[in-house]
Amino acid sequence: MRRGAYTPRSTPFPRDRRSYNAGKGRSFRSYRRRGPVRPLARRNLFGDDHARAFTYKTLSEDQFGPDFTIHNNNYKSSYISMPVKTRALSDNRVGDYIKLVNISFTGTVCIKNSQMESDGSPMLGLHGLFTCVLVRDKTPRIYSATEPLIPFPQLFGSINASYADLSIQDPYKDRFTVIRQVSYPVNTEKGDHMCRFKGTRRFGGRYPIWTSFKDDGGSGDSSGLYSNTYKNAILVYYVWLSDVSSQLEMYCKYVTRYIG
């Protein structure tokens, strides 16, 4: 084997090692960004709680009592109260708008036959249909001084419309939308009957529902009442249809989940 001087192989690349080693051994500090580094997000050092309080919250409301007593072939109109603008930690809102997440409700109705036998004893037998319907009012406004909410027959055509799936009348379709309807038939030979009802409605998807409020600074009204709602109030109608003279008493609990 021959020993002697090493002869490198020919290569098309330049033999200048300085170009190959350029950049090697250079200090990492030379690549550091010059000047101060700004934070990724602005920080309020003086405690603005508005953004922090805009979180998921829950509001409960019970509807019952003499105002919710319904006679046969009649209805009761109401609405779901929205949160009040306060600095409380729960059941409130921090701005003049909220985003509705879902509304669930559970309740009980007690129906009694009002007719009497010839001997003065209560007449037996109850037959009818109870309906609870939730309606979205896109632009709330008081209907009249005596009846603030739009009447059920005017909105749906007649009170007997609750025998089927409810549909808004043409003149009001741009303003109102049915968002939930539950119906329970009653058919018993007894003189009284009690049943439970429930339902839920989730909001979201491509078209979420944002409820905004007037919050007039002059009058100091920052409530969740229908009169203070600027857009997207939720109306409720209870209907009891029966050919038997009867009276319905009810209790209903609403749970509204929202961001606000």
From Swiss-Prot:
Motif (Bipartite nuclear localization signal): 21-42
Annotated motif Nuclear localization signal, positions: 84-100
Assigned keywords, A-Z: DNA-binding, Host cell membrane, Host cytoplasm, Host membrane, Host nucleus, Host-virus interaction, Membrane, Transport, Viral movement protein
One Pfam family in the UniProt entry: Gemini_coat
Region Interaction with Arabidopsis thaliana NSI protein: start-end pairs: 154-191
Disordered: region residues: 1-29
Molecular function via GO: single-stranded DNA binding; structural molecule activity
Intracellular or extracellular location(s): Host nucleus; Host cytoplasm; Host cell membrane
Protein topology in the membrane: Peripheral membrane protein
Protein name: Nuclear shuttle protein
Species whose genome carries this gene: Indian cassava mosaic virus
Function text: Binds to the genomic viral ssDNA, shuttles it into and out of the cell nucleus. Begomoviruses use 2 proteins to transport their DNA from cell to cell. The nuclear shuttle protein (NSP) shuttles it between nucleus and cytoplasm and the movement protein (MP) probably transports the DNA-NSP complex to the cell periphery and facilitates movement across the cell wall.
UniProt similarity note: Belongs to the begomovirus nuclear shuttle protein family.
Cellular component, GO, one term: host cell plasma membrane
Biological process, per Gene Ontology: DNA transport; transport of virus in host, cell to cell
